[in-house]
UniProtKB/Swiss-Prot annotation:
Organism: Acidovorax ebreus (strain TPSY) (Diaphorobacter sp. (strain TPSY))
Sequence positions that bind Mg(2+) 1: D7, D145
Gene that this sequence comes from: ruvC
GO CC, any one term: Holliday junction resolvase complex
Keywords for the protein's UniProt record, in alphabetical order: Cytoplasm, DNA damage, DNA recombination, DNA repair, DNA-binding, Endonuclease, Hydrolase, Magnesium, Metal-binding, Nuclease
CDD domains hit by this protein: RuvC
InterPro entries, per database record: RNaseH-like_sf, RNaseH_sf, X-over_junc_endoDNase_Mg_BS, X-over_junc_endoDNase_RuvC
Compartment(s): Cytoplasm
Record: residues binding Mg(2+) 2: E73
The name this protein goes by in its record: Crossover junction endodeoxyribonuclease RuvC
Residues at the active site: D7, E73, D145
Amino acid sequence: MRILGIDPGLQTTGFGVVDVDGHRLRYVASGTIRTTGRATGLALGDLPGRLKVLFDGVSEVAARYQPSTAAVEIIFVNVNPQSTLLLGQARGAALTALVNANLPVAEYTALQMKKAVVGHGRAAKSQVQEMVRRLLELPGLPGTDAADALGLAITHAHAGAAMARVGEVAQLTRRQHAMYKAGRSY
């Protein structure tokens, strides 16, 4: 399974792609999508243009790496309501690009991601970077946005493995129930 993690942001959106085979994680790619500056020619005030750059960037990453699923960070309510609204719009552009690519999308809070990757939800960005580097056996630290995106992909891989185990237990329980009803022991 190939998972695309997205850490949405209006100025910089991180992405990370991880392959999962059983319990093995393999790094595929990571990077950032920037919505301002020389590369885009857009100013900070051009919100619609920046959202289009973000949508197109996420669409391009999804087309290039062909993930089977995606994981996106759920935003928190910031002290500044305007910042929260702007981040929500960026997140909406990223989600729309993923859904447009027919990808199932899972959502995780930063706390859930940090707990899954580092072991506790109050981890610093540097701790997330270091654990992502170790888990994916990277030669160097990824940038903070890319590390968060890779962390989301890792979180989803762990959640998928846990759900598969729950499914196996449910299958076993159904089988045991059927055997019990048929009068056989299990």
